[in-house]
């Protein structure tokens, strides 16, 4: 899970400073972030659905991975529904002040959630600066 970096922030700010990005443009940013992944990683994500949620999600959540990380799968893992990565459009825009910041935060959030698919937990991501 990727949470807002502001300690204690449990809801989106209502200060009129939230940048607005059209849904289609935001989705393009997510696609660009995914396209920026190395080809080898992309091939290992064939059974992962990446979606954008345009309504506010759980408080403070930028992205969410739901599924069984590759490191936890056994030989019995088969026939499962795709894992899912959700990127929360309103939450990301709420912490950004410029379009460039939105692009960078989308990229960081996508990489963060993809890392969970590969079995990297939040503690290790924090150690790595993600």
What is each model feature region?
Residues 1-105, 117, 123-126:
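Active-site rim/adjacent substrate-binding subdomains
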């Amino acid at each position: 899970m990727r949470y807002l970096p502001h300690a204690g922030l449990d809801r989106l700010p209502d200060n009129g400073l939230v940048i607005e990005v059209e849904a289609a443009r935001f989705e393009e940013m997510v696609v660009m972030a995914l396209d920026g992944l190395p080809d080898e990683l992309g091939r290992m994500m064939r059974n992962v659905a990446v979606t954008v949620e345009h309504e506010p999600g759980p408080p403070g959540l930028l992205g969410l991975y739901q599924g069984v990380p590759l490191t936890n799968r056994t030989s019995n893992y088969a026939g499962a529904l795709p894992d899912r990565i959700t990127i929360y459009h309103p939450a990301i825009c709420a912490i950004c002040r410029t379009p460039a910041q939105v692009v960078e935060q989308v990229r960081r959030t996508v990489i963060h959630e993809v890392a969970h698919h590969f079995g990297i937990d939040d503690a290790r991501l924090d150690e790595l600066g993600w």
